[in-house]
């Protein structure tokens, strides 16, 4: 396949005003996408965004470009990424566009596309769009220009969709939940969803100002929600990231429940109800504790490369339904086409209600093994992972760890780094093993 110039594994992303993330590119991208998408279908595109101040600028630019190509545009305003995927399906739009840089700081932004079925846009279509980007922008004639409208009830539609994933015979009455919206796209959605299901909700990170998204709040910064759960004597906490496709949780003791533990809860619940299809997909970074806990229940476990895109690919290949990353990207293909933090939280709460159990009880049988990650910088073209010294060190550590440990060495995709990850039963031993391999990598660099 031809190498892509603009689209990465998750659309286009970067610092606003530099590189690719400029209003000029957004305008041209809208036009190029419009040219490709207008060849078939409804000629209707939905645009959603998170709460970054630059979102308005990119929304206007994309809107103008799509209209110039003859496509009608439906604006949603600030809405979670999975909401854009859902409403793209329900409106039978030709595509959905999300303006977001997910968990990145406010000064970054990004643009990615969903296909008409709410899944990632096909690679070949992205290549076609890139080919159109190389051409001069030519506006269609005035009577063919696209029209722009706003989906006034987008929020209500998505709230009802989320609530529909919670079993009708249960409520959240009696639960006190802290919900951290990361000052992002879920700020006006998530608290309402859990309140309407009956919970007492304490919302934090729900006051976006365009420049505070993901700033010391949300799924990538868990300190505040842990403190709030303890201070409010809450039953649990739910932390989402800036665009709402990622979730981390907190139990009543203020302990973080990560994506691996959430996957365990969902798999156990599905198996107990006889609806688990196949097994669970994690990644190379998933904790060995998840693997061992699922083994004990005879639930198959497979690892993909790091990235929710690769989790999705392996789920489809195996025809399984549940997968995700320890960072909180959770996929359940019985409940959506993309990662959805709110719905993942709803499914965990449903498991709690069905089993009349606390979050602590649902995770008690899964032992998270100590995991140490050491980054080693290297110079030049030489690959340290091919060194005999590194291979010997890795083999030595793996022999000492046995079946209750794991070693993973991989190159960073963005920096000249070798990532050394070691897991095992004893933290001090794991740390020593990781440093032993890291020293071998350094000497081979």
Swiss-Prot record:
Entry's Gene Ontology BP terms: carbohydrate metabolic process; peptidoglycan biosynthetic process; UDP-N-acetylglucosamine biosynthetic process
NCBIfam families: glmM, PRK10887.1
Biological classification of the source: Bacteria, Pseudomonadati, Pseudomonadota, Gammaproteobacteria, Alteromonadales
InterPro entries: A-D-PHexomutase_a/b/a-I, A-D-PHexomutase_a/b/a-I/II/III, A-D-PHexomutase_a/b/a-II, A-D-PHexomutase_a/b/a-III, A-D-PHexomutase_C, A-D-PHexomutase_C_sf, A-D-PHexomutase_CS, Alpha-D-phosphohexomutase_SF
Active site per database record: 102 (phosphoserine intermediate)
CDD domains given in the database record: GlmM
Reaction(s) this enzyme catalyzes, per UniProt: alpha-D-glucosamine 1-phosphate = D-glucosamine 6-phosphate
Functional summary from the UniProt entry: Catalyzes the conversion of glucosamine-6-phosphate to glucosamine-1-phosphate.
EC number in record: 5.4.2.10
The protein, known as: Phosphoglucosamine mutase
GO cellular component, one term: cytosol
GO function terms (MF aspect): magnesium ion binding; phosphoglucosamine mutase activity; phosphomannomutase activity
PTM comment text: Activated by phosphorylation.
Residues binding Mg(2+): 102, 241, 243, 245
PTM-bearing positions, type Phosphoserine: 102
Gene this protein is translated from: glmM
Alphabetical list of SUPFAM superfamilies matching this protein: Phosphoglucomutase, C-terminal domain, Phosphoglucomutase, first 3 domains
Needed co-factor(s): Mg(2+)
Stored Pfam families: PGM_PMM_I, PGM_PMM_II, PGM_PMM_III, PGM_PMM_IV
SS bond list: none
């Amino acid at each position: 396949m031809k190498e892509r110039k603009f689209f990465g594994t998750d659309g286009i992303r970067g610092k606003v005003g530099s590189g690719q993330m400029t209003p000029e590119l957004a305008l041209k991208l809208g036009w190029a996408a419009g040219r490709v998408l207008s060849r078939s279908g409804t000629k209707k595109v939905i645009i959603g965004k998170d709460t970054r101040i630059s979102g308005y600028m990119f929304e206007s630019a994309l809107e103008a470009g799509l209209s110039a190509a003859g496509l009608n545009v439906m604006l949603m305003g600030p809405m979670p990424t999975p909401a854009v995927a859902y409403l793209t399906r329900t409106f039978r739009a030709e595509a959905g566009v999300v303006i977001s840089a997910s968990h990145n700081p406010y000064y970054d932004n990004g643009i990615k596309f969903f296909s008409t079925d709410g899944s990632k846009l096909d690679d070949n279509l992205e290549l076609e769009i890139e080919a159109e980007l190389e051409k001069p922008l030519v506006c269609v004639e005035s009577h063919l220009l696209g029209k722009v409208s706003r989906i006034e009830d987008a929020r209500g539609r998505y709230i009802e969709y989320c609530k529909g994933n919670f079993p009708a015979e249960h409520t959240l009455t009696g639960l006190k939940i802290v919900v951290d919206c990361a000052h992002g796209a879920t700020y006006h959605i998530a608290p309402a969803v859990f309140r309407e299901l009956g919970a007492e909700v304490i919302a934090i990170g729900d006051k976006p100002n365009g420049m505070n998204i993901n700033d010391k709040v949300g799924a990538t910064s868990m300190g505040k929600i842990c403190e709030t759960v303890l201070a409010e004597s809450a039953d649990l906490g739910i932390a989402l990231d800036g665009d709402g496709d990622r979730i981390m949780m907190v139990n009543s003791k203020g302990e973080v429940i990560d994506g691996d533990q959430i996957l365990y809860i969902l798999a156990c619940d599905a198996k107990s109800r006889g609806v688990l299809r196949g097994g669970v997909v994690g990644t190379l970074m998933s904790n060995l504790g998840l693997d061992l806990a699922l083994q004990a229940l005879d639930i198959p476990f497979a690892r993909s490369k790091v990235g929710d895109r690769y989790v999705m690919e392996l789920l489809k290949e195996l025809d399984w339904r549940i997968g995700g990353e320890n960072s909180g990207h959770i996929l359940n293909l019985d409940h959506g086409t993309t990662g959805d933090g709110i719905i993942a939280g709803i499914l965990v709460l449903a498991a709690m209600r069905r089993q009349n159990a606390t979050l602590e009880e649902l995770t008690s049988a899964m032992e998270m093994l100590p995991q140490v990650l050491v980054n080693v910088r290297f110079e030049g073209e030489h690959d340290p992972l091919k060194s005999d010294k590194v291979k010997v060190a890795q083999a030595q550590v793996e022999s000492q760890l046995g079946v209750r440990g794991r070693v993973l060495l991989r190159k960073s995709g963005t920096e000249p780094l070798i990532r050394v990850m070691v897991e095992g039963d004893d933290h001090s031993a794991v740390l020593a093993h990781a440093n032993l391999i890291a020293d071998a990598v350094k000497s081979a660099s």
